[in-house]
């Protein structure tokens, strides 16, 4: 619970300011803005079931570990380019990572909560998580204008700082949590790319062909 609260605090150091960066500093059109924001939402919907199957197989913690290490790089990737095409690509990556993290964070809190006090435990988590989000936003809002600028923008510096803070939180706190369910041990590479082996791909194509013949 502590890890997720601090991770969301770190996430909200810069999360509320992506829209301001796009609209006030890059001056992109509202159509481009909607495209960038919708890309993440669509990607999340496409992969959330995929992540769920992997969480059932390898456990919530395994998926949390993978996705928690991916999320900090979302902020860092925003420093690479300000083109709409690049930012849409970053949002694809972001939607992929956040779909797994949010899904498994919620399921892990449910699994870890003592059954006799589950409602109280989850309510306390929600309250402290909301407090962490508020504190993170306040830190970002007050810190941003005082940071040195990268390419003429303090938003980019804020993204860099937030990405580093998120990495520190993951590396410092994640080791303190452990899986509460009995799950099989599986390598991260097998969890992510296991479906890309020839047998799995052949099965996938066979299912598509069978459905097309119905």
Where are these regions (language model features)?
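Pair of pore-lining "gating" transmembrane helices in MFS-fold secondary transporters
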Residues: 1-16, 92, 206-212
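Helix-to-loop junctions at the C-terminal end of transmembrane segments
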Residues: 46-59, 144
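Cytoplasmic membrane-interface "Motif A"-like loop-to-helix N-cap segments
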Residues: 57-68, 150-153
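Structural signature of the two symmetry-related core transmembrane helices
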Residues: 62-77, 163
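Helix-loop junctions at membrane interfaces in 12-TM secondary transporters
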Residues: 77-91
């Amino acid at each position: 619970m502590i890890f997720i609260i601090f991770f969301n605090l770190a996430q909200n150091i810069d999360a509320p300011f992506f829209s301001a960066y796009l609209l006030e500093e890059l001056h992109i059109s509202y159509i481009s803005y909607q495209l960038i924001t919708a890309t993440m939402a669509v990607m999340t919907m496409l992969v959330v079931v995929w992540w769920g199957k992997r969480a059932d197989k390898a456990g919530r913690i395994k998926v949390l570990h993978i996705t928690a290490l991916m999320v900090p790089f979302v902020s860092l990737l925003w420093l690479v380019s300000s083109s709409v095409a690049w930012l849409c690509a970053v949002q694809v990556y972001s939607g992929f990572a956040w779909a797994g993290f949010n899904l498994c964070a919620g399921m892990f809190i449910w699994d870890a909560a003592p059954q006799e006090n589950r409602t109280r435990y989850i309510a306390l988590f929600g309250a402290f998580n909301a407090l962490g989000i508020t504190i993170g936003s306040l830190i970002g809002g007050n810190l941003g204008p005082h940071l040195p600028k990268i390419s003429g923008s303090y938003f980019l510096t804020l993204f860099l700082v937030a990405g580093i803070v998120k990495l520190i939180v993951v590396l410092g706190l994640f080791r303190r949590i452990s899986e509460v369910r009995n799950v099989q041990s599986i390598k991260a590479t097998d969890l992510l790319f296991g479906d890309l082996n020839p047998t799995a791909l052949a099965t996938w194509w066979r299912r598509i062909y069978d459905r097309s013949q119905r």
